[in-house]
Amino acid sequence: MVQSCSAYGCKNRYDKDKPVSFHKFPLTRPSLCKEWEAAVRRKNFKPTKYSSICSEHFTPDCFKRECNNKLLKENAVPTIFLCTEPHDKKEDLLEPQEQLPPPPLPPPVSQVDAAIGLLMPPLQTPVNLSVFCDHNYTVEDTMHQRKRIHQLEQQVEKLRKKLKTAQQRCRRQERQLEKLKEVVHFQKEKDDVSERGYVILPNDYFEIVEVPA
């Protein structure tokens, strides 16, 4: 579904070649969503998860300066509307003295476009990543995921170092075991040689016997 602006009279639709972003109604924040609905000034209009307002209806200070100003601030409310929905016939038939004075006109579209164009240059990203944010927390989620990946990479590196240390310790123990085997083998050979040698008896082991002539 191609995104389009829900503001009355606005013909903007999503086009990757135009520096116009679209922002979903904050349905999860009822109070802020009511402010958006009131700003749109459309009777019997109930936004859905597919409803959005384009960036031309927000003043430049509504955007965050990071990420090429494609994200709205948390409490941003659209205020720039050149067209409003026509009133009922009953209201149109009021006497001239009863009619309210017209509201002040907002700045021309060209001026707003120029301001947005200066503050919001087109975002140069790959085609598969050029879709505008569906909500205001996409970049925050991406940053959190990158931070988590970095933490996992650090943990993997620590485990690799521990594994390397354990392997070195194991090799040292194997060398020590080989040395002990050599010592035991040498001791056995020495014991075998001792068993085949002469036995020296003490001097008092023999008794001198006198034989008569």
UniProtKB/Swiss-Prot annotation:
Signal peptide: none annotated. Changing F58A: Abolishes DNA- and zinc-binding. Changing H23P: In DYT6; lower activity than wild-type. Changing L32A: Does not affect DNA-binding. Changing Y50A: Partially affects DNA-binding. InterPro entries: THAP1/10, THAP_Znf, THAP_Znf_sf. SMART domains: DM3, THAP. DNA-binding transcription regulator that regulates endothelial cell proliferation and G1/S cell-cycle progression. Specifically binds the 5'-[AT]NTNN[GT]GGCA[AGT]-3' core DNA sequence and acts by modulating expression of pRB-E2F cell-cycle target genes, including RRM1. Component of a THAP1/THAP3-HCFC1-OGT complex that is required for the regulation of the transcriptional activity of RRM1. May also have pro-apoptotic activity by potentiating both serum-withdrawal and TNF-induced apoptosis. This is THAP domain-containing protein 1. It comes from Homo sapiens (Human). The lineage of its organism: Eukaryota, Metazoa, Chordata, Craniata, Vertebrata.
